[in-house]
């Protein structure tokens, strides 16, 4: 059977070679993409895809940073879709470029294909030494009018041979490790103003007054005070003074506290608060249908289990706080941002100022890297507001560490309630998983400008906005609630819980981390009930051969060694969104008498389709493992009725270098298959593997993350 290649959704909107390539720099191919570098080095992978197909050195390919004035709009850099969408588009454009260029050159040089020499973008006639290059070709109408097909058949693909698994140097890596790389925080323009926001201690505080003597002191020091509604900023050409006086201002302002945070235990609130419940169908779509009761079983030989798993609030915690630079000049905003969602940001800013979108240009400039909706959009919006008040002047606004920890939208706390039934043949005949959570979708938009945290302060409107449940397949709370496994009967329910205390939005994997961790833990508990091997119960409930191969590869790898005395092992598996890459994780850990958990070894097997860049895949899954391990073992946002307590790294614990395991990572190559997103695939399996290894160690399931001494002790005693 012929294997075809689909160009992906981006080509449907941008089907000209000119949408993807720029040949204005002699000797280099510059490639456009609508995806951005947020720590995953996607630009290196995209450059490699182009270079190996168009037959030019990797060093001669440059990825043009996103600019909303001219780069393709490929949506948010999220949901593990960068290589799947932008990578596929660039692959399609590269195939189209190469095949059309060869045909054009053969015609222009009047030679046969066996007579050409093709190196570094130049085709030469072996006999006459006449030549033509990509740069020559890019000037022709033939190039300018060429359309990228939406699909390629096998005959075309056979003509485009290329190698995989090349070793490359990441773009800009030398500058990054030597400190020469410029982030948005490092921007410096003549006469630029540095800004800091002065915030209250809590979300819903209205400005009452600012000390008049303090205002005079600001004037004496040539420092600007910007106030609109309850939005307060300090600005100075001297960054040190902006920082100093913004700190002093905190004690010079009187706020009215409109509403405290809920003092109740968040898990009590998740159970008790008003909620909207939707049934999740096989395939992952959520529908507004009657929720069936959990089925009862009284059949002989059927074992039933129920369990409840809990996850606390998590923060993004980027190593550098959010920042943005903006200027308003000639009736146009130019904003430098490290947001993942720059085209939506452009729309939102234009909507706030009631101007045409053409009057807002967002230029991506890297920050410290973050997966999800952190403070990047908020700070860009705030910088644009300040720039309007100071026309023709660049405003560089940096959040503080406390800003980032206390004002970013978190990943929601959640509960998963599971019930299952397994018969004597080891078949799971019934599976129920019910998820309870706040929203994972509160990105700002034209219609929801109040999702900018400062929009509320600018307008003194602290009305609590209720989110609406998302219904598309594997969206938000119910991402990966529908398992890949074949269970005889399933009951899957998402509950969007209202009036929870903290601001929440998209954090890496959305609800999938909690859903997969709880499912993989509960699956092991059902296996133990019938004394079934954890690998066997998973494989026996799968008919996807690629999923089975991933699990078998992990099993064979782990069998090459045995757990050392007092070490314990666990596994986890999923296919992210049931449509992205497949991933199986094994963990070996040790737990001390003091309940300190030490990660020893992590085995990871991943199938991401055709390998775009193997080292990049390994870096993504190993880095994703570390982040998920940190969530599982350490991280939780602490708060009380008055404030967020987790203001810094002392009060928000993360994994340290002393608990990074040894990695053994296998990437299965499926050359000719579609690229599958890999950025988020490892998180859920990691949580499941650690949970299962901990159960192996303790003989009891710990059901509240993070698995701290306090949570372990509490559950063991109860």
Write out the residue ranges for each language-model feature.
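Cofactor-binding beta-sheet edge motifs in enzyme active sites
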Residues: 1-718
